[in-house]
Every structure is written in C-alpha cells, then in structure tokens.
C-alpha cells in the first residue's frame, strides 16, 4: 500500500496504463471504514448471557429452616447435658454405677391403686366362677337330645344315619 501503483483493490486481467488507482483506493478505503464501523456497532444475535439466577434456586429456605431446627435441637441437647454435668458436680459423690432410672410419673400412685382395685375385682370374679356348680342335669339333656333326634327322623323322608 505504500505505492499507489502497487495497489489494485480489484485486479483486472488487462490493465491499462491510464487506469487510476488513487480514486479506486479512496473508494475502497471509505468502504472499509464504513464496514469497520458497522462491525463495531453490530450486537450479537445469539444470547451469550448466563441464565437469570433466581434466588429460590440458589437459596433454599426449607433447607436453611431445617438446618436451623437441627442446630436448635443440638443446642438444646447441649444445654441439657451441661445441666446434668453441673448437677453431677454439685451433688454428692455417687460411687455405684447401677442407679437405675425410675420413671417419675405424676400419677403413678393413682395407677397403682387402680391396678390393685382391678386385680381384686378379677380375683373375686374368679372365686365366684369357681364356686358355682353346674345347674343342668346331664340325664335330662340326653333325653331331650334323643327326643329331638326321633322327631327329626319321623319327619324326614330319608334316614339321617344308618346306625340309628
């Protein structure tokens, strides 16, 4: 591009000595600058931005809430353990290691009274049942059964049993 004679934007097969390259060079340079400006102004047609980040995708509130509940539970248990340790240090020394836990129910005595009452009632019912004698006669029930069998035999067309 140093020499205007060396420049031909559109080389021709047959060149003429009168052919002026400076005008053609100006036109081509103007088109080049125009093209360069257009390329700089152009915005991409393809969206290359990252997708919109929604907060509820990233910040899971239910997970945070569950984690907070778990932390609260751990802190509560830690406080309970600290209280037990403090009570152990404050209280008298206990050498034996088989102190069994007794349930500290508020209504244990009333439940025990109810259990004793029910047990006594059951024993009374059992005693009354065992003291009772049977009040039916075996001989009369057998006679009734034979009579009913005879009535059935007399009223049916076919025999019920061959051995009767």
Curated annotation (Swiss-Prot):
Phenotype when the gene is knocked out: Male subfertility. Sperm show an impaired ability to penetrate the zona pellucida and abnormal motility characterized by frequent stalling in the anti-hook position with the flagellum and hook of the sperm head pointing in opposite directions. Sperm flagella lack outer microtubule doublet 4 in 63% of mutants while doublet 7 is missing in 14.8% of mutants.
Coiled coil: 61-88
Keywords, in A-Z order: Coiled coil
BP terms from Gene Ontology: sperm axoneme assembly
General function of this protein: Required for male fertility through its role in axonemal doublet stabilization which is essential for sperm motility and fertilization.
Family the UniProt entry places it in: Belongs to the CFAP97 family.
Protein name according to UniProt: Sperm axonemal maintenance protein CFAP97D1
Species of the source: Mus musculus (Mouse)
Chain's gene name: Cfap97d1
């Amino acid at each position: 591009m140093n020499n205007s004679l060396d420049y031909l934007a559109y080389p021709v097969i047959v060149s003429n000595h009168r052919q002026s390259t400076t005008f053609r060079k100006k036109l081509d340079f103007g088109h080049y600058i125009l093209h360069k400006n257009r390329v700089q102004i152009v915005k991409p047609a393809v969206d290359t931005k990252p997708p919109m980040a929604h907060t509820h995708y990233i910040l899971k509130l239910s997970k945070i809430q569950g984690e907070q509940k778990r932390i609260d539970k751990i802190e509560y248990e830690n406080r309970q353990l600290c209280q037990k340790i403090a009570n152990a240090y404050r209280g008298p020394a206990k050498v034996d290691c088989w102190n069994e836990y007794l349930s500290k129910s508020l209504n244990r005595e009333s439940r025990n009274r109810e259990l004793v009452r029910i047990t006594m009632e059951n024993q009374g019912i059992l005693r009354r049942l065992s003291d009772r004698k049977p009040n039916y006669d075996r001989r009369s029930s057998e006679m009734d059964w034979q009579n009913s069998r005879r009535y059935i035999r007399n009223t049916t067309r076919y025999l019920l049993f061959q051995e009767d």
